[in-house]
């Protein structure tokens, strides 16, 4: 019986993983980088929507449906929040085409033949969209709260005020990776998930 391997397998099984054998151990013992999706760091229930502010005479239900359609299309962090807001009815989701991600800014897509953006103020400004003042933003951003904007056809339609919670289980595993000096590569379509946020939330080194 390979006792060390057995102990490792038992520990990993609690996280839904396993070691296939000593060959796998030898193959991965020199790993120095781990790639993970943002959903792995902020699992279901980690993101809280505090409020929605609508603009441009837009119907808030249409804004939510646009956001839900895009988040489901890209499996975004906010997917479950918006699905819950439409009662989990995926049949009413709109067709989403030509999705593009702008690094550290957000997403652009075609929905119902119109250009829809969801992301940061930076993304909106890249598309020359008129924005609420930063003083207006400050009324809603306090503590760890963040903002994402939704725009449709060149106009801001909604502002979402969000916060992100950490997971104790994820924190433990990231601590193991950090102590072993394993680099973390995070794939995210949410501009609020940055190196600085991960470092602040989980104590994982930025470099």
What residues fall within each predicted segment?
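Conserved cytosolic catalytic loops of P-type ATPases
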Residues: 22-66, 110
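Short, small/polar residue-rich loop motifs at catalytic or cofactor-binding pockets
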Residues: 28-31, 103, 142-144
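ATP-binding catalytic core of ATPases
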Residues: 53-104, 125-138
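Helix-loop-beta junctions that constitute the ligand-sensing/allosteric loops
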Residues: 142-149, 182-183
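Conserved ATP-binding TGD loop and adjacent catalytic N/P-domain core of P-type ATPases
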Residues: 19, 111-113, 152-207
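A generic structural motif
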Residues: 49, 56, 122, 163-164
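Hydrophobic alpha-helical transmembrane segments
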Residues: 1-37, 67-70, 177, 206
